[in-house]
Curated annotation (Swiss-Prot):
Family in the record: Belongs to the class I-like SAM-binding methyltransferase superfamily. RNA methyltransferase RlmE family.
Subcellular location: Cytoplasm
GO cellular component: cytoplasm
EC number from the UniProt entry: 2.1.1.166
GN (gene name): rlmE
Catalyzed reaction equations: uridine(2552) in 23S rRNA + S-adenosyl-L-methionine = 2'-O-methyluridine(2552) in 23S rRNA + S-adenosyl-L-homocysteine + H(+)
Protein name as it appears in the record: Ribosomal RNA large subunit methyltransferase E
A single GO molecular function term of this UniProt record: rRNA (uridine-2'-O-)-methyltransferase activity
Entry function: Specifically methylates the uridine in position 2552 of 23S rRNA at the 2'-O position of the ribose in the fully assembled 50S ribosomal subunit.
Binding-site list for S-adenosyl-L-methionine: 63, 65, 83, 99, 124
Length: 209
């Protein structure tokens, strides 16, 4: 019975996925993922990216956000990206495969950053969801806390932090924490984000010294 339910659920997800207009547009344009459109909407409203910036992209694979960001920062910009999963190369992106919760991977990531002044830290990280909020939300909050910690370590004063967060227990506290660190904080729900999804995007600009 459980197997049948899981199969039906998977079938519904696949049907929804491939009928999604943003998935179809991404395929037509040769984009890595529909996440490209989410970041485009954020850029249109918040003007995060500028030519020449250095960016850290966490949870980067398959590369939708990095693929978008390189079009905004140009040849003089640089992206340091990290993910557990492999990612096909993108010109202008220095990709590190590994779990940045691992001390050696984190060290390698920070070495890539070096003395660069990072203007944007962005995270589209999400755990493998089991469908139970009591399990999924704490896992997701753990990842966004790590992303915020990374922004504390490498983000230059005045820099920006963009992070995907799933609404639920701990969200309000996390938002308060970000507001204490940045001068302007917005919560965005892009049109390209599925309406039934708990995901929202916190866009924080003007990191306080």
């Amino acid at each position: 019975m459980t197997g049948k339910k899981r199969s039906a659920s998977s079938s519904r997800w696949l049907q929804e996925h491939f009928s999604d207009k943003y998935v179809q547009q991404a395929q037509k344009k040769g984009l890595r993922s529909r996440a490209w459109f989410k970041l485009d909407e954020i850029q249109q409203s918040d003007k995060i990216f500028k030519p020449g910036m250095t960016i850290v992209d966490l949870g980067a694979a398959p590369g939708g956000w990095s693929q978008y960001a390189v079009t905004q920062i140009g040849n003089s910009g640089r992206i340091i990206a990290c993910d557990l999963l492999p990612m096909d190369p993108i010109v202008g992106v220095d990709f590190l495969q590994g779990d940045f919760r691992d001390e050696l991977v984190l060290k390698a990531l920070l070495e890539r950053v070096g003395d660069s002044k990072v203007q944007v830290v962005m995270s589209d990280m999400a755990p493998n969801m089991c469908g139970t909020p009591a399990v999924d939300i704490p896992r997701a909050m753990y990842l966004v806390e790590l992303a915020l910690e990374m922004s504390r370590d490498v983000l230059a004063p005045g820099g920006s932090f963009v992070v995907k967060v799933f609404q639920g227990e701990g969200f309000d506290e996390y938002l308060r924490e970000i507001r204490s660190l940045f001068t302007k904080v917005k919560v965005r729900k892009p049109d390209s984000s599925r309406a039934r999804s708990r995901e929202v995007y916190i866009v924080a600009t003007g990191r306080k010294p």
